[in-house]
Amino acid sequence: MDGKGPTESFFGVHAGGYTKSQSHAHGEDLATLVDALKPKPTELVLDVATGTGFTAMALAPYVSHVTGIDVTAEMLDEARKLAHNGGVLNVSFELGDAQATKFADWTYDIVTTRRAAHHFQDVPRFLREAYRVLRPKGRLGIVDMSPPEGTEAFCNQIERLRDGSHIEAFTPNAWKSMVAEAGFQTQFSEVVGEQVTFERWLYPIELGGKEEVAVRTAWRSARQETRLQLNADYSNEVKSWTKSRIVLVAVK
């Protein structure tokens, strides 16, 4: 046994694939997040569950320094390579837990997490941790898959079938409620939709495996109402659907 949990195991194997993901590197949600955060040249940023570092490097040109933390060493290795190859000097990457960072109170001006919170064991605990390390009036920036009300059970089902480390994706209203309970005030909230083909959604999992079979079976059993809500192109088999992500910025 290597002692790794489901998240480390999944992303350790697929780190290289995420480095090549155009959606992660250039998704509309990333530009929306950076714009909504309004980063300043003197600010320090903590990017939680940084993965291969796309969010950290997108923010780096606008701030003093970005620290990216992640539980998966292989993802951090990819992030360091991308930063080096891109000449991004004001970023650093280290192992760290989203729900229990080592940083002191009031350390950061901005805390971000993008496309990762659905892997967190305890999202409210992460939000409390973000609140702790943020300075007064600091901003929290979140991007995560966020299914429409009424589709969350199905969306979480297929995400878990694709990736066993997926825990839960929350609706926009659930996110706003959790953020408020942690002490933040939401300043910006927008849902960004991306029409994804089955193949693009499954990536970096390869076609033809047990994951594809299980997910296609789930789609066949899905309610027609769910397919309509997700804007699914469905004729005998699902071809594409709209994957929704919330972009949320809140202030301490």
Model-derived segments and their meaning:
Residues 124-139:
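A short glycine-rich, Lys/Arg-flanked "PGG" loop and its adjoining helix->strand segment in the class I
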Residues 1-40, 54-58, 75-78, 85-86, 141-166, ...:
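Conserved class I S-adenosyl-L-methionine
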Residues 46-100:
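Class I SAM-dependent methyltransferase SAM/SAH-binding core
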Residues 99-110:
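A short acidic, Gly/Pro-enriched loop at the edge of an enzyme's catalytic core
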Residues 168-182:
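Short alpha-helix
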Residues 52, 186-252:
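Conserved Class I S-adenosyl-L-methionine
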